[in-house]
Amino acid sequence: MARPRGGRWLLGVLLALCRLAAPLAKSLEPVSWSAGNPKFMSGKGLVIYPEIGDKLDIICPKAEPSKPYDYYKLYLVKKDQADACSTVMDPNVLVTCNRPEQEIRFTIKFQEFSPNYMGLEFKRQQDYFITSTSNGTLDGLENREGGVCQTRSMKIVMKVGQDPNAVIPEQLTTSRPSKEADNTVKIVTQSPRHKVPTVEEPGKPGSVNQNGQETQGPSDGFLSSKVAVFAAIGAGCVIFILIIIFLVVLLIKIRKRHRKHTQQRAAALSLSTLASPKCSGNAGSEPSDIIIPLRTTENNYCPHYEKVSGDYGHPVYIVQEMPPQSPANIYYKV
């Protein structure tokens, strides 16, 4: 009993050491999405440097009694869209700030592989952009151009797995998460009094758009998967056609071989029938006549003739007199 306990203890120590050796994920400082946030720098927005495994919370603050509530719709966009402050083409909604009575919290987890098919996935050394083209009013919630992205530089630039002290050239390869819409990321709303988290349902105002992150725009992963599917279908069709052709050729060869064998067998039977002596009469010949058949068979035996000699050449038979009958075969008289 002591050995199993010692083995479990050693295994627990090894697991603890592995956890300590692995890089610890951290939660980044939450970002309050409001026009009064001084972190949004003019012309640049907010630049952060997350690592794989980190988490980021974007907070839509609750309305203050003395100030009007700001309505925003946040999008995950490409670099050219963030620079132009336009979400006309391929809009991808992350969260909608439209609940003045409560705080809305949107959590992003930076992960390379998501357990959810529709989850967000990020790659190292790439940039991702979040912005809003709403103007802060309820009527301007659905604006697709300009908005606070242009007037207040309200955008977040996420440089995943990059060093903030490194000198990075201007031309960078930017892309969106390779998977489509984010089902794993939850929008948790809290009431300051009760602190009861609730997950918003898709389709309602203020929830994440579940239709997909790259619904209309080109996606390398999606296109590669479609090409692979079509290639597999084409290869399957070609293999199926080749199998059908092979079976047809094999069937034709088998039928030809069977037909040839049947013809040879029929010809052998006809020659054997012509050469075999039948139990027929002498058709008017004398008792001493000698008949040499075309072919003899050892198995056939007729009681009215007797084999005299067959050691050299054709066998010789002495035919006895029988009543005249119609001959069935042809014989040569010697």
UniProtKB/Swiss-Prot annotation:
GO molecular function: ephrin receptor binding
Biased composition (Polar residues): 207-218
Gene Ontology cellular component terms for the protein in this record: cytosol; glutamatergic synapse; plasma membrane; presynaptic membrane
Domain of life: Eukaryota
Residues exposed to the Extracellular side: 26-231
Post-translational modification remark: Inducible phosphorylation of tyrosine residues in the cytoplasmic domain.
Cysteine disulfide partners in this protein: 60-97, 85-149
Main location: membrane
Membrane topology: Single-pass type I membrane protein
A Gene Ontology biological process term: axon guidance
Membrane-side (Cytoplasmic) residue stretches: 253-334
Entry-linked InterPro entries: Cupredoxin, Ephrin, Ephrin-B_Ecto, Ephrin_CS, Ephrin_RBD
Residues the record marks as carrying a glycan: 135
Ranges annotated as spanning the membrane: 232-252
Position of the signal peptide: 1-25
Localisation: Membrane
Region (Disordered): 175-218
SUPFAM superfamilies: Cupredoxins (SSF49503)
Protein family (similarity comment): Belongs to the ephrin family.
Subunit structure: Binds to the receptor tyrosine kinase EPHB2. Interacts with GRIP1 and GRIP2.
Functional description taken from the UniProt entry: Cell surface transmembrane ligand for Eph receptors, a family of receptor tyrosine kinases which are crucial for migration, repulsion and adhesion during neuronal, vascular and epithelial development. Binds promiscuously Eph receptors residing on adjacent cells, leading to contact-dependent bidirectional signaling into neighboring cells. The signaling pathway downstream of the receptor is referred to as forward signaling while the signaling pathway downstream of the ephrin ligand is referred to as reverse signaling.
Record protein name field: Ephrin-B1
Gene name of the encoded protein: EFNB1
